[in-house]
Amino acid sequence: MLTNMRKEYAELRREDETSPGRVFWITGLSGAGKTTLGRELSNRLRAAGRQITFLDGDDLRAVIAEELGHSAGDRRRSAMRNARLCQLLARQGGDVVCATISLFHEVQRWNRENIPGYREIYLRVPLDELRRRDSKGIYARVQRGDARDVVGIDLAAEAPEAPDLILDNYGALDVAAAVDRILALCASPDGAGARHSAALVAFKTKAESLDALAPLLRNGCVLPQVRFSVVDWHSDNAEVLARVIAAPWGSDRVIVRSSSRGEDGSAGRSQAGKYDSVLGVTGSAAIAQAIDQVIDSFANDGSDEDQIFVQPMLDRVAMAGVVFSRSPSGGPYFIINYDDRSGLTDRVTAGAGDNLKTFLCLKSRPGACPPSLASVIDLVRELETLLSCDAIDVEFAVGDDGRLYLLQVRPLAIEWQEPSTNDEKVETALANVARKVELLSRPHPYLHGSRAIFGVMPDWNPAEIIGVRPWPLSLSLYRELITDAIWAYQRDNYGYQNLRSFPLMVSFHGLPYIDVRVSFNSFVPRGVPDDLAGRLVNYYIDRLLSEPHLHDKVEFEIIFSCYTLDLPERMSRIAEHGFSPQDLAELSGALRRLTNRIIHGETALWRRDRGKIDLLAQRLPTVRNAEIDKISRIYWLIEDCKRYGTLPFAGLARAGFIAVQLLQSFVEVGVLNAEEGATFMASVDTVGSRIGQDFAQLSKADFLVRYGHLRPGTYDILSPRYDEAPDLYFDWSNARPASSAPARFALSIEQLRRIEQLLKEHELDIDVLSLIEFIKAGIEGREYAKFVFTRSLSDALSLIKQLGEEHGLSVEDCAFLNYDAIRTLYSESGSVREVLVESVARGRECHALTRNLVLPPIIASPDEVFAFHLPPSQPNFITRKNVTAPVASVGDPPESFAGRILFVPSADPGFDWIFTRGISGFVTQFGGANSHMAIRASELGIPAVIGAGEAMYQRWRGAKKLCLDCTSQRVLVIA
């Protein structure tokens, strides 16, 4: 094929020699390989009979810009001279190849406007790779301080906005193949280098694409095939069968595959998995039956031109999987989902494996991938070059002999939000994140622990509450109301270490993470000696790193944050890690004192916080009805929400965690069995249980007065309140009473005596009835507090929406606001519109980058910012029930939810409305064992999987029918 292409290019000599020439402008940073590529391109054009002038940037500087320096201004002037010279030479009818840095948008735009035959080729190389090569020693001199004004280091490099061709040179560039791609630009009608142009191989049907790639691949191989159309089969199936059987492999096990014209991007859509493939077929009769099955799967949208192809079955498989060469949002990542356990080729595509792995790697850092995946990435890079497409979906398999097979390749079916020229911004942003991780991981004089790690789920789990890519307004409000200061004030009040002035949550370019070292410090009881505190924090961090699936269960499985009846047994684990009996006694005593202070008597801390929440409910009408402007009303709603809402809520949330841990300890020491523990949880009277009852009993108007402020996304201005879109959430014609009465829980006399005895033995200063009251009130109080404070927050969001509308901003615009803008407007006299518009513009720009960033759920080192495996997740199974039902997602029409297992992104209590829709069960991507929705599921008796994690959530959501087996704690894909 390459020979034919070169013959085609040789026909360029027939062109009119007097026609204007073309300019091939090869640009990139110093050391990218521009000169090498330019010389080879010049030689090939010259061999084709073209008149060629090759201009190298260093030579040009010596001839026409000798007096200029290397400042940004001088470099711009030099680049413009190069551009004008190229224009002049091209007017004479010859082609010009110019290899130059010249990374200025101004120059690139001038070239496009003034040079008719302009072709822009961008050689893209990451800085780390350039520093490694450094053939001219430039980067080494910069590092020593002997050089300055180097583009990409201390001078900005303006990557081309719309290059005709991007060539990624991460290692040894295949110069010949690169020149083929450049020459192919000349053959395209408009010369445009869009993502799918200038390809050596064009995407066709699945079978045709594989057939075209087979003789060209160097880093993989393609299984042989027999291909035929539907009309071929219907015309003479005997002849087709004879061809299959006559193949050298035809009498062995084969796979019969679809190759429809409407799949794999042939018609602009992938239709992945829509049509059948039949594996492991042997013999003429079985093959004929399999072919009929595949044709039948084309159904009504098939045609006689659709194809079927048969290949030998790949039986001895060491690894198989799927690679995306872009993230779903268009970010520059390789995403490899693979199975190296089952020995089968279809576990990933079927979503049926329990041991599937997912690896993500920034495309500019291929060296960071494990050796077992290096050859897979090499194959994908080669396919990107051959297909001239940097967004592809590749299925592969590795035989047990180490041979790599390409099973399928198609354009990646994603909706582009940002152009690929933002890849450099992504790389720069991730470099900044890695640097921040390194800085925050250093020892700190006011923190215990020798290292830091970061997670999306521990402690105040932002992934559950605001999401992993929250809108700027959501992120800034969560910081304002919880994670900047409130969290630390309340934890200090409850007897833990004083972490005031430490933000709990950091933002990595808009991705929220908990600083886990700060969090673990805050759970050390006040009074614990510094040496013991430091060793405890290090132990907690090491434990989380060794068992990352516990990241949403740290308070139950890793740290010791309160005294429970099973604490001595739980502490035996740390005794195995160098903690002495004296250490255990000191920690145990501190936890006992802290717990007694929180739960004891009428002066218990949780009682005071419960009273403050009621005060917020009383103050809300005062702010609502005050004769103050909208900005002031927003400001005071948030201020009151902090002081009388989230501050006591943080305390009640702490009490709620302690309550659940105490209840679990009843089960662990044998006072209650697991069924009795579940019955207690089902007997708790929370907002979640009352909302279903009130929906059946109250009028629509009264129901919305009580619950109308709730939103599925508590901090999300784009999430309508219940009273803004009631018919979206509720089926008012089907308001039926709860199917069963609330559970009744009672302790036997013997159980009461046993608990009383244990309380005395463990020196907990509370009687059994008061303890039961605390556990019940702790769980209920946490839910009630959130219900109350979210009313103030929801009102503030509605007012922000109104404020935006008054100044020409849509509600979508308002999502990009930072709450700092409201605070500025309250305390300063600036133009309201200008402040809002500027904040929206900044937020929109930042969030565009945030959408393209992917980070692991736990970051333990700077290197993990660029390449990582998604850790296995250990979901939380709620109830001991089982259910088998079809699947639905929260974005589907609500009327379709009844009788289905519903997929919900987070465990936010604003999703309470789903419980009025008759769902059979639900699964959340994020959320912990003690999350709001876990409590809802427990009290309502609905089977649920809370915190499935990204990989399993996406896999299960893609199924048609699931079984949630909460008894055995497993999820089965039924269809």
State each model region's role.
Residues 665-669, 747-852:
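Extended, domain-scale alpha-helical bundle/helix-rich regions
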Residues 127, 132-183, 188:
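Small-molecule kinase domains that catalyze NTP-dependent phosphoryl transfer to phosphate-bearing small molecules
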Residues 99, 114-133, 167:
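Conserved phosphate-donor/acceptor-positioning beta-strand/loop module used by diverse small-molecule
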Residues 1-23:
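Extreme N-terminal, non-catalytic leader segments
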Residues 34:
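Conserved lysine of the Walker
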Residues 192-220, 229-234, 267-268, 287-293, ...:
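Conserved divalent-metal-coordinating catalytic cores
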Residues 39-84:
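Conserved substrate/cofactor phosphate-moiety recognition/catalytic segment
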Residues 26:
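Hydrophobic anchor at the beta1->P-loop junction of P-loop NTPases
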